[in-house]
């Protein structure tokens, strides 16, 4: 149903936001980004029509 689709979309967006925050924190602490987190983030962004750089998703 539509509710389930929206729920999955929100969960995916929250997971992406969490990974972005982790990458930022690690970059501030160590001066570089975590390879594992950036790879996982790339997989999540590629898995659907979610485009974090368009509109107010940024």
Curated annotation (Swiss-Prot):
Pfam families: Vpu. Its main location: host cell. One of its GO terms (biological process) is receptor catabolic process. One of its GO terms (molecular function) is CD4 receptor binding. It is found in: Host membrane. The modification Phosphoserine is found at residues 30, 34. GO terms for cellular component: host cell membrane; membrane. SUPFAM superfamilies: HIV-1 VPU cytoplasmic domain. The keyword Membrane applies. The keyword Ion transport applies. Ion channel activity is inhibited by hexamethylene amiloride in vitro. It is a single-pass type I membrane protein. Keywords: AIDS, Apoptosis, Host membrane, Host-virus interaction, Ion channel, Ion transport, Membrane, Phosphoprotein, Transmembrane, Transport. InterPro entries: Vpu, Vpu_cyt_dom_sf. Phosphorylated by host CK2. This phosphorylation is necessary for interaction with human BRCP and degradation of CD4. It comes from the Viruses. Belongs to the HIV-1 VPU protein family. The N-terminus and transmembrane domains are required for self-oligomerization and proper virion budding, whereas the cytoplasmic domain is required for CD4 degradation. The cytoplasmic domain is composed of 2 amphipathic alpha helix that form a U-shape. HIV-1 lineages are divided in three main groups, M (for Major), O (for Outlier), and N (for New, or Non-M, Non-O). The vast majority of strains found worldwide belong to the group M. Group O seems to be endemic to and largely confined to Cameroon and neighboring countries in West Central Africa, where these viruses represent a small minority of HIV-1 strains. The group N is represented by a limited number of isolates from Cameroonian persons. The group M is further subdivided in 9 clades or subtypes (A to D, F to H, J and K). Enhances virion budding, by targeting human CD4 and Tetherin/BST2 to proteasome degradation. Degradation of CD4 prevents any unwanted premature interactions between viral Env and its receptor human CD4 in the endoplasmic reticulum. Degradation of antiretroviral protein Tetherin/BST2 is important for virion budding, as BST2 tethers new viral particles to the host cell membrane. Mechanistically, Vpu bridges either CD4 or BST2 to BTRC, a substrate recognition subunit of the Skp1/Cullin/F-box protein E3 ubiquitin ligase, induces their ubiquitination and subsequent proteasomal degradation. Homopentamer. Interacts with host CD4 and BRTC; these interactions induce proteasomal degradation of CD4. Interacts with host BST2; this interaction leads to the degradation of host BST2. Interacts with host FBXW11. Interacts with host AP1M1; this interaction plays a role in the mistrafficking and subsequent degradation of host BST2. Interacts with host RANBP2; this interaction allows Vpu to down-regulate host BLM sumoylation. This is Protein Vpu. It comes from Human immunodeficiency virus type 1 group M subtype A (isolate Z321). The gene is vpu.
